[in-house]
Amino acid sequence: MSKTLNIIWQYLRAFVLIYACLYAGIFIASLLPVTIPGSIIGMLILFVLLALQILPAKWVNPGCYVLIRYMALLFVPIGVGVMQYFDLLRAQFGPVVVSCAVSTLVVFLVVSWSSQLVHGERKVVGQKGSEE
C-alpha cells in the first residue's frame, strides 16, 4: 500500500508542478503588453527552475515521461481541429508552404551559427596540424 501511495504521490507532484508552471506562465502572459503564449512562458519557467536546480528533475520526470509517451495521441485533437479550416488552408497553401520553408531555413542557420559560436572549430584526430 505504501509503495502504491508513493507512486501516486510522484505522479501527482509531477503534474502539479508542470501545471503550476503552465498557469504561472499564463498569468505572466496576461500581464505583458506583448502577445506571448502563456504555455511558452510556463515552459521557460519550468526550464529555469530545472536549470538552476531549484526544482529537482526527478520530481517532474514521471509526469514528463507520461506526456512524452502519449504525445502523438495528444496531437490528434489538434489535427482534427485544423481540418475545420481546410478551405482556408487550401486557399493559403502557397504562403503557408513558403513560410514553413523560410522558417525552417532560418532555424537551421541560427542553430548552425550558434553551434559554431559555442563549440568553435575543433581539430579532428589524425588531421594534419593536430599534433601537439
UniProtKB/Swiss-Prot annotation:
Membrane spanning stretches: 7-27, 31-51, 63-83, 93-113
UniProt-annotated location(s): Cell inner membrane
Record membrane topology: Multi-pass membrane protein
Spans within the Periplasmic topological domain: 1-6, 52-62, 114-132
Cytoplasmic membrane side: 28-30, 84-92
Transport recorded as keyword: no
Keywords: Cell inner membrane, Cell membrane, Membrane, Transmembrane, Transmembrane helix
Any one annotated GO CC term: plasma membrane
Cysteine disulfide partners in this protein: none
NCBIfam families named in the record: PRK01821.1 (NF002494)
Similarity annotation: Belongs to the UPF0299 family.
Name of the protein in its database record: UPF0299 membrane protein YohJ
